């Protein structure tokens, strides 16, 4: 996983991104027909911001929410690009994210090969420390 990076930020929201490597370890090529990310941040746990996530192939990014299927060659690495749009509720995104908790996310993808298709799931966690580090690096760079 690449480090979390701020793509854009204004007073009320922030867009962050990172990539996750994927490799076909099977014995034949396969196709990723569908993929999406589900975040686990219920408002009972954290209600100061809302999170929207998009997932695309890193080498062919899209911003329309459409998943473009791609072929996975055997042992040839590719990467998923994950973008998080976080919108604060108070009008000050930095204040809203001060106590942002660790946020689990599932990457769910449909694989098709010669056998029947199946869904696979990988869980990753966006830690509050990773978020603070990305925000600090961005805001300190903006001030220079």
Model-derived regions, located:
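Short, surface-exposed loop/turn segments at beta-strand-coil junctions that are enriched for proline
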Residues: 87-97
């Amino acid at each position: 996983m690449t480090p979390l990076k701020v793509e854009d930020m204004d007073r009320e929201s922030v867009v962050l991104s990172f990539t996750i490597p994927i490799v076909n370890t099977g014995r034949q090529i396969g196709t990723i027909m569908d993929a999406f990310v589900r975040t686990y941040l219920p408002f009972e746990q954290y209600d100061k911001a809302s999170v929207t996530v998009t997932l695309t192939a890193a080498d062919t990014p899209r911003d329309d929410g459409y998943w473009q299927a791609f072929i996975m060659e055997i042992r040839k690495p590719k990467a998923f690009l994950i973008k998080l749009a976080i919108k604060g509720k108070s009008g000050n995104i930095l204040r809203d994210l001060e106590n942002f908790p660790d946020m689990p996310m599932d990457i769910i993808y449909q694989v098709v090969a010669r056998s029947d298709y199946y869904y696979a799931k990988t869980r990753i966690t966006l830690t509050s420390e990773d978020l603070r580090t990305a925000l600090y690096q961005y805001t300190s760079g903006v001030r220079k």
